[in-house]
Amino acid sequence: YGPNLPGCPPGPYPRICARYCHSDRECKAGYYCCNTGCLNICVPKPKPGLCPAIRPGPCKGNVCSNDQDCPGNQKCCGKPGCRRCYRPEKPGSCPPRKYDAGVCVIYCVGDFDCPGNEKCCGSCPRRCEKPCFD
């Protein structure tokens, strides 16, 4: 319950305040009560994980509006008007890069091309590596 939780709608807010919920218990399963200061509404809880880095490209409109619109563990990611369902990044960060010389080979595109908890790291070469945790 609070104004800065993920999934709370951005302003501007209506001039007429409304309280559709007072706590998370009043929302259906998978939702929580979002307090924007003037408007309390039940919004879908975001799925765990982070959105992957999204390559710029042509925008063909929104496919999803929130994580609940996406199948399985996929998340609704992207800028407004270009939102799509993506598999989330795995936790952790890529280790510092050592100098790579030689052939540029792409072994993975995203984290879910990698086994276990390994992440897809680097740009050239791009390969699966064990993550670092801060």
Swiss-Prot record:
It holds the Pfam family WAP. Nacreous layer of shell. SMART domains: WAP (SM00217). One of its GO terms (molecular function) is serine-type endopeptidase inhibitor activity. One of its GO terms (cellular component) is extracellular space. It comes from the Eukaryota. Residues 2-45, 46-89, 90-132 form the WAP domain. Disulfide bonds join C8-C34, C17-C38, C21-C33, C27-C42, C51-C77, C59-C82, C64-C76, C70-C85, C94-C121, C104-C124, C108-C120, C114-C128. Keywords: Disulfide bond, Repeat. PANTHER family: PERLWAPIN ISOFORM X1 (PTHR19441:SF95), WHEY ACDIC PROTEIN WAP (PTHR19441). Inhibits growth of calcium carbonate crystals. May inhibit growth of certain crystallographic planes in the mineral phase of nacre in the shell. This is Perlwapin. The lineage of its organism: Eukaryota, Metazoa, Spiralia, Lophotrochozoa, Mollusca.
